[in-house]
Amino acid sequence: SEGRSRLLGAPVPVRENDEGLQRALQFAMAEYNKASNDKYSSRVVRIISAKQQLVSGIKYIMEVEIGRTTCPKSSADLQSCEFHDEPEMAKYTTCNFVVYSIPWLNQIKLLKSSCQ
């Protein structure tokens, strides 16, 4: 496993349009919205930083700014949800998410979620 061990290691930056990153972020936001007791859904405003780390799967380490949308929790298509106009309603927050993904086993889990 000489070749494999070289791949493991430090987190490296990942492009915002990376498919795995997008999936990880979507998953993190779904979990965030599930756990929040807000009646509105939140979604990502912008990605501040994103890294991936190859362990026995892929760990995505993300710092994102999220905002509260005008859509209730039940709404399916979050991407088309508008953000609240009033800043105190929009509640922009910076969150750190760590998602662990093993795509070939179809496994994904949120390891860390902390928002300021």
Swiss-Prot record:
Entry keyword Manganese: no
UniProt motif Secondary area of contact: location: 53-57
Compartments reported by the entry: Secreted
Top-level taxon in the UniProt lineage: Eukaryota
Keywords, ordered alphabetically: Disulfide bond, Phosphoprotein, Protease inhibitor, Secreted, Thiol protease inhibitor
Family under the similarity heading: Belongs to the cystatin family.
Entry protein name: Cystatin
